[in-house]
From Swiss-Prot:
PANTHER family from the UniProt entry: AROM/DEHYDROQUINATE SYNTHASE, PENTAFUNCTIONAL AROM POLYPEPTIDE
Family (UniProt): Belongs to the EPSP synthase family.
Protein name as catalogued: 3-phosphoshikimate 1-carboxyvinyltransferase
Keyword Amino-acid biosynthesis: yes
A Pfam family the protein falls into: EPSP_synthase
Gene Ontology biological process terms in this record: amino acid biosynthetic process; aromatic amino acid family biosynthetic process; chorismate biosynthetic process
Reactions performed catalytically: 3-phosphoshikimate + phosphoenolpyruvate = 5-O-(1-carboxyvinyl)-3-phosphoshikimate + phosphate
Keyword Zinc appears in the UniProt entry: no
Family annotation (Gene3D superfamilies): Enolpyruvate transferase domain
Active site: 315
Length: 429
């Protein structure tokens, strides 16, 4: 397992672009594969998670070519996938597994989904349960709670489902099954989760309607291939936003970041803490809002983070924890129990690591209380095999007194293979 040592930084300065959005990259492969005609994707994220989705569709007979600039998908149509001859390996990707479970439930063949030890430990009943109500035949370990999942494609019927969690993965899995189901499928959720599936499926020609609190899909519509430009991933930009806010003397411009309003919780939170962030050059690309973000070092103040902003910032909480650890006062996070079932328990992991760095943190079942300190201590941090924990603690190391080492950093390749080089390029020492 590879460790990485971080030295304190004098400032974070320059202009960068972050890799393509992971959520949109996954969906571009999935939706392009079940469309008729050609889909061309630029800005595709070549991280391990999105590549797992790409390889899964190749294993189901889809021709996908990648010349390093553009990913070209020769769509097979809604019913054109072939039965895979082997287990579909989702690696560490919960998005791959959960969305594929919905998509495969309505096929006319058998398939098996598995992944690495971390993915095999994550809860799948939240997807398997509602799909079973649609007529899906899915079995797995622990009564369908854990992967591997065996899926015998079957005839599906539309349902109305009130999701107990605000999860784009749950919503999207049900929507994808709804493409193959008779009648209408309706999903409601407590707070709006990211809406990339709704936007993109509509662009491909699916019958998708949104309404306050939910989405409706009518089955049977044929999808048509299209060109997609993937914006920069705001979840990847988050580490640089926090780095520039907490390192004195910093001034950083991040170009071409996706600022879909269902994903900009990180911006709302950091601004709420007093962060100097400015969105410029706002435009629309492939149905997604995009902007450049300028961020400067700021004195941060604690705040309460709860309610509807939580699902809009769910993947950015490890980075938010680092910002909160240096904010004046006590930051209270509530309504974020979903963090406990990510690649690792992110509440426990960040609490453990930041305590090592000298921060006073109290865990709660659905969040934490973080009392900021004047400075962090260098420490030996543990990534727990989670890419976002690893990158967050590397950012924390930029302002720590002394050296910070982070264990098992190869997990970063799941979402951001070039992170270390990009960070080194803007850190002044």
């Amino acid at each position: 397992m590879e460790n990485y040592t971080v030295q304190p930084a004098k400032s974070v300065r320059g202009e960068i672009s972050v890799p393509g959005d992971k959520s949109i990259s996954h969906r571009s492969i999935m939706f392009g594969s079940i469309s008729s005609g050609v889909t061309k994707v630029t800005g595709f994220l070549r991280g391990e998670d999105a590549l797992a989705t790409l390889q899964a569709f190749r294993a189901m007979g889809v021709q996908i070519d990648d010349d390093g600039e553009t990913v070209t998908i020769q769509g097979r149509g809604l019913h054109g996938l072939s039965e895979p001859t082997d287990v579909l390996d989702c690696g560490n990707s919960g998005t791959s597994m959960r969305l594929l479970t919905g998509l495969l439930a309505g096929q006319n063949f058998f398939s098996v989904l598995s992944g690495d030890k971390y993915l095999r430990a994550r809860p799948m009943k939240r997807v398997v349960g509602p799909l079973a109500l649609m007529g899906a035949r899915i079995s797995g370990r622990a009564g369908g709670e854990k992967a591997p999942l065996a899926i015998q494609g079957s005839k599906l019927i539309g349902i109305e489902y009130d999701s107990p969690v605000s999860s784009a993965q749950v919503k999207s899995a049900i929507m994808l099954a709804g493409l193959y189901a008779g009648g209408e499928t309706v999903v409601r959720e407590p707070h709006l989760s990211r809406d990339h599936s709704e936007r993109m499926l509509r662009a491909f020609g699916a019958h998708v309607e949104t309404f306050p609190g939910g989405v409706k899909v009518r089955g049977g519509a044929e999808l048509t291939g299209r060109d997609i430009v993937v914006p920069g991933d705001i979840s990847s930009a988050a580490f640089f936003l926090v780095a520039a806010l907490i390192v004195p003397g910093s001034d950083l411009l991040i170009r071409g970041v996706g600022v879909n309003p269902t994903r900009t919780g990180i911006i709302d939170v950091l601004k709420g803490m007093g962060g100097d962030l400015e969105l410029t050059n706002q435009r629309d690309e492939s149905g997604e809002p995009v902007a450049d973000i300028r961020v400067r070092h700021s004195k941060l103040t604690a705040m309460e983070i709860c309610g509807e902003v939580v699902p809009r910032a769910i993947d950015e909480f490890p980075a938010i924890c680092v910002a909160a650890s240096l904010a004046q006062g006590t930051t209270v996070v509530r309504d974020a129990a979903e963090l406990r079932v990510k690649e690792t328990d992110r509440i426990s992991a960040m609490a453990d690591n930041l305590r090592r760095a000298g921060v006073n943190i109290v865990e709660t079942p659905d969040g934490m209380q973080i009392t900021g300190v004047a400075s962090l201590k260098g420490c030996a941090a543990d990534s727990f095999g989670d890419h976002r924990i690893a990158m967050s603690m590397m950012v924390a190391g930029l302002v720590a007194q002394g050296e910070t080492s982070v264990s098992d950093v190869e997990c970063i390749a799941t979402s951001f293979p070039g992170f270390v080089n990009l960070l080194d390029g803007v850190v002044q020492r």
